[in-house]
Amino acid sequence: MYFYPGSKQIVNIIRVIKFLSLPALDTGRPWVHLRKVVRTPSIAMFIQTEATPNPATLKFLPGREVMGEGAVADFPSAETAGRSPLAKALFEIPEVSRVFFGADFISVTKRDGDWKHLKPSILGTVMEHFTRGLPLMEGAADETEETYNDEDSDVVAQIKELIETRVRPAVAQDGGDIIFKGFDGSSGVVSLHLQGSCAGCPSSTMTLKNGIENMLRHYVPEVTAVEAV
């Protein structure tokens, strides 16, 4: 994960055409996933994939809203996916180790295997979920911490604003998210929680120290360091 909003993204456009009822047809081209033609009506879907700075994570954009603006859902293991039919379905793929939902994308992290062989299974799962009109989450939404709180000190409010306006939009482009967890006024340490492609990314330490920490120290003199929790 690099904290450079202008960094080039590797984008592959994947056209996925679904014809219901029959199994997938192997075209011999890993970037195209087709289903056999049947008499039932077809549903066309275009799923875009983007590489992330974390080689173990790939970003899938279904061309429609996923969580919606400002909302995220992180599933670091299959045990945490109980309320999401899509997350549960993705974890049924043996190589999948983590799933993350952003505003309009899905990040999938693998434990092993080659993306060339893993992508068709993920694409088929995502496509089936949306074409069947299944809910993304079941039950009441979890309560989330308010971004801003009237009781926040001026320093905390300033830190939160910088994270919301400068950090989160940048890391979302890389398929992840960073959440403010706290500020220790006595030590000046800001605690952040990494999600999605950011978690376990080889470059996350560099991003925290060279990108986020330097920015926060520049704008908020009270900040001395940033650490992941």
What are these regions (language model features)?
Residues 2-229:
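Domain-level signature for proteins that mediate thiol-based redox and metal-cofactor handling
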